[in-house]
């Protein structure tokens, strides 16, 4: 998954 929490306009984490 992606970074969570998001920072610098990244996409939210997948569920």
Curated annotation (Swiss-Prot):
Lineage, top ranks: Eukaryota, Metazoa, Spiralia, Lophotrochozoa, Mollusca
The UniProt family comment states:
Belongs to the conotoxin M superfamily.
What keywords is this UniProt entry annotated with?
Answer: Amidation, Disulfide bond, Neurotoxin, Secreted, Toxin
Instruction: Kindly give any further remark recorded in the entry.
Output: Negative results: does not show effect on Nav1.1, Nav1.2, Nav1.3, Nav1.4, Nav1.5, Nav1.6, Nav1.8. Does not show effect on Kv1.1, Kv1.2, Kv1.3, Kv1.4, Kv1.5, and Kv1.6. Does not show effect on muscular (alpha-1-beta-1-delta-epsilon) and neuronal alpha-7, alpha-4-beta-4, and alpha-3-beta-4 nAChRs.
The job of this chain, per UniProt, is described as: Does not show any effect on voltage-gated sodium and potassium channels (10 uM of toxin tested), and on nicotinic acetylcholine receptors (5 uM of toxin tested). Does not show antibacterial activity on both Gram-negative and Gram-positive bacteria. Intraperitoneal injection into fish provokes paralysis.
> How does the entry describe the domains?
The cysteine framework is III (CC-C-C-CC).
- Sequence positions bearing Tyrosine amide: 15
Please list the tissues where expression of this protein has been recorded. Answer: Expressed by the venom duct.
Question: Superkingdom of the source?
Answer: Eukaryota
Chain coiled-coil ranges: none
List GO terms (cellular component aspect).
Answer: extracellular region
Q: What is its main location?
A: secreted
Disulfide topology: 1-14, 2-10, 6-13
For this entry, the protein name equals: Conotoxin Asi3a
- Compartments (UniProt record): Secreted
Give this protein's Gene Ontology molecular function annotations: toxin activity
Tell me the organism: Conus asiaticus
Could you confirm whether the keyword Disulfide bond appears in this record? yes
